[in-house]
Amino acid sequence: MKKLLNISYAILICLFCTGTSTAQNAKAEKKAEKTAELKRIVEGKNYVFKANSANPTGNSSVQVSGSSMQAGNLASMMGGGSIALTGTYDLTLSNDTLTAFLPYYGVAYTAPLNPTEGGIKFKTTKFDYKVTEKKKGNIEISFKPLDLQQRAPGDVQRMIMTVSAGGYANLQITLLNRQPISFTGTLEEVKPKPAS
């Protein structure tokens, strides 16, 4: 009887290890598929980053909708410095055209002449584009606008987007005359519109 019990335990342990191994293999295969899909989307240069929240880096005061607020008040009001965005704010790469329509929260060292040009808004076809594979299936995409006429309104020096295999992304923007800002959101493929 004791021998039968030991054999049963050994069989159960083998089954458990095999089941765990199979589950790990399935999980690894699924992650590899997601990574391959993400790589295909990024290399196709036809996608949109949809921003869900903005993360200003200022520590003294932050300009919000025309009124100056202390960063501590903003952080407590907005939940730790992250500002949830409503509406459609995005960065789109489509047909070799880079288009940005993002808000800006933070300290500006020079003010725009037109108060409606306070966000990060531009459209350009002249930019450097570099894709780097990182650990754990993440991909880093670097954008650098080259056209000074296009860069001047938004004063964008460089943008770095880190995208996970699941499509979640973090966009960090370095600006010439303003403090840096980052955004979190998702990366989605832009489907081509059917010809009519």
Question: Where are the model-predicted features located?
Answer:
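Structural motif
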Residues: 46, 97-99, 168
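Helix-rich interaction surfaces within compact, conserved domain-sized segments
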Residues: 29-44, 127-196
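Bacterial Sec-dependent N-terminal signal peptides
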Residues: 1-29
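Mid-length scaffold segments of soluble, non-membrane domains
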Residues: 80-135
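N-terminal post-signal-peptidase region of extra-cytosolic proteins
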Residues: 33-35, 69-87
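Surface-exposed, interaction-prone regions used to assemble/regulate multi-protein complexes
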Residues: 62-72, 87, 113, 194
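Sec-dependent signal peptide cleavage junction
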Residues: 19-59, 68-70, 196
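Generic short beta-strand segments
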Residues: 50-57, 103-104, 144-146
